[in-house]
Regions:
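Structural/interface elements that position substrates and couple domains in central-metabolism enzymes
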Residues: 1-423
Length: 423
């Protein structure tokens, strides 16, 4: 039986849980170019909160080693690339990290090695972008000297129920034999099983439509929420009623941020445009979802006016800043759109999030984040429950309000009252 030594490139939300998973059975080297990240992991601290200290220490004491030195990957025979694939300022795919990772792996490749990509991309990237870099850097021939596969990540940050170990993973390979080998490798560490796709492009396409479909469905609900707000109908009550039908899909309106659903559709949109197709539904869904932060802010202003509360220089408390609940990730958070729109009316805005890193928020978004509840003002005109972290839901939100103040509940998590408004 073939013995494997696994190299994981990228130790973020995707790569590190994957490294811990493979290290249960195989010698595994986790590589990340950021020394600070490697140091914290080696100390047993995962700042993404995906893996517990106990699990990290258990893996480090057996098969796992973390490093910022790519040369320590040299003895590996399977390389798994799990680096970010964001978009640029023009909403175009940014493959910089993927190209750099491919170049790093290419400098290490040996005869018979396998390179597996997990990063979300448009169909064709693995074979048309990554493989040429591997060939050129390694001086080896694709599908003769080395092979590639694609197994798209399905990490849901903050979700302790659906983990990398117990969800079904799509696998694929550059030859039928390699595809079966990659599938067997993943199956050897997963409890949720695998789905062997017929080609790498099929696997790439499957991943990108998973997130694009969710984006479209949420956009529909956001549009519905805007309509029902005008008609003075409770959107969540409508969804609850409609959910009594067996095949109704109970998506909820809200903010769509983060590094997956709010980003990945642009990869398929760009690929479609290159081939002369204008994917209007996906593009409109993106516009709708990207508009929701500003829309919510103006809904808040409207409610302040209707209640006779001050708008100019009003005191506002935003609860939650990360892109989703129970997760420290602030990348592409749409709470910033609420904040910046409200800034046109008042400078008295406090932003609270116990999960987020205050220094990173200040550096990326230029705002001061409060992480301690004891520091929060209690005389706010409006409290906006932006991100319903469990710890926030367990507190009395009313304690932060003036007697006549209002609450805007973005995701509809609080019981309705005459002082609560929501999408």
């Amino acid at each position: 039986m073939k013995s494997y030594k696994i190299g994981i490139i990228g130790l973020g939300y995707v790569g590190f849980p994957l490294a811990c998973l493979f290290a249960k059975k195989y010698p595994t080297v986790g590589y990340d170019p950021y020394q600070e990240r490697v140091v914290r992991l080696s100390e047993g601290v995962d700042v993404t909160n995906e893996i517990s200290t106990e699990v990290i220490q258990a893996r480090l004491s057996t098969h796992l080693r973390c490093t910022a030195n790519p040369n320590e990957l040299r003895d590996c025979n399977v390389y798994i690339v799990a680096v970010p694939t964001p978009i640029d300022l023009y909403q175009q795919p940014d493959l910089t990290a993927l190209r750099e990772a491919s170049s790093t792996v290419g400098s290490l490749l040996k005869q018979g090695d396998i390179v597996i990509y997990e990063s979300t991309v448009y169909p064709g990237v693995t074979e048309e972008v990554c493989v040429p870099i591997l060939e050129q850097t390694a001086g080896l021939t694709f599908n003769r000297d080395f092979y590639v596969g694609y197994s798209p990540e399905r990490i849901n940050p903050g979700d302790k129920q659906h983990t990398v170990e117990n969800i079904c993973k799509i696998t694929s390979g550059s030859t039928p034999e390699i595809a079966r080998e990659i599938d067997a490798l993943y199956n050897s560490v997963l409890t949720g099983g695998t789905y062997l796709a017929s080609s790498i492009k099929v696997a790439e396409a499957a991943k990108v439509i998973e997130n694009a479909q969710r984006d479209v469905n949420i956009a529909f609900m956001n549009e519905i929420a805007k309509i029902f707000n005008i008609l003075d109908i409770d959107t969540n009550a409508v969804i609850d009623a409609a959910s009594s039908k067996w095949n109704f899909l109970p998506f909820r309106p809200g903010l769509v941020g983060g590094h997956c659903i709010g980003v990945d559709p642009y990869y398929l949109i760009q690929k479609a445009k290159l081939h002369g197709v204008s994917p209007r539904l996906m593009m409109e869904a993106r516009k709708t979802n990207d508009s929701m932060g500003g829309y919510i802010a103006y809904q808040i202003i409207n409610q302040l006016c209707l209640r006779g509360l001050p708008v100019k220089d009003s005191r506002v408390l935003l609860l939650g800043f990360t892109f989703k609940e129970n997760c420290p990730d602030t990348r592409n958070t749409k709470v910033i759109d609420i904040y910046r729109t409200l800034q046109h009316f008042t400078d008295n805005i406090t932003v609270y999030d116990p999960f987020a890193n205050a220094e990173r928020v200040a550096e990326e978004y230029g705002l001061t984040l409060t992480t301690e509840p004891a520091q929060l003002p209690t005389d706010n005109d409006v409290v906006v429950l932006c991100v319903p972290h469990q710890c926030i839901l367990q507190t009395d939100v009313y304690q932060y309000l003036k007697p006549e103040g209002i609450i805007y509940d973005v995701k509809g998590k609080l019981p309705l009252s005459e002082r609560i408004y929501r999408l």
